[in-house]
Amino acid sequence: MRYWAARADDSAPPWPGTAEIDRLEFVPAGRAAARLTHPRDVDLVTAAASALGAPPDDTAPLIILRHTKASSRKRWEGPDADRPLDPKGTAQADRLSVLLACYGIDRVVSSDALRCLDTVRPYATAVRAHVEHEPRVTEDAHEKAPQGAGDAVRELLASGDAAVLCSHRPVLPTLLEALGPLPHSAFPPADVTDQTLSPGSFVVVHRRVAGGEVEVVGVERHDL
């Protein structure tokens, strides 16, 4: 079982209740701990409040995303940059749109390869966001100058924006290494930064930026 910390959305509809849960109520961490009856739950709330050190909305996510499933490289006869998603990849991109919405992403950055652009396009369209083309994270650019891909990640990390960066499998090791040391998470570090992310899978880095300094407070991984 894994837990997340998030800010309550006042515009969310009332909780309808389930067979196990009658009512949903948000209270400050201190009051929540006082109302809990199981010591392990108290420890969980205390640890979460201590780790955050500030309200969850003081952080912003940066998502490193591998494009969804593309057409076969061997069978494609045109330029590789124009290789499209296959039907499964198109369906995955639609599913990703829902997942990305959970993180409030408002900045969409992508390799200018068609398969990457089409991976993030459904989400960008849904939230009316402009898709920024980032040529430094294409496969060709990375092969010639990998430092550029790392710089692109570090710039996004320092921006403090809630952003997603979509790129390619061969580029992922450079992008993930550019994140720097990651804090303890629910995942072993090798799993979080596994360089073999499957198509459509992503790593989320939660960070806060203050005075030009970047503090990563949490990291998670989702396999599509």
Tell me the role of every PLM-derived stretch:
Residues P28, H67, H168:
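Short, conserved phosphate/pyrophosphate- and ester-handling motifs at nucleotide-, phospho-/glycolipid
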Residues V217-L224:
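Short, solvent-exposed aromatic-acidic interface loops
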Residues R2-W4, S201-V203:
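Short beta-strand micro-motifs in enzyme catalytic cores
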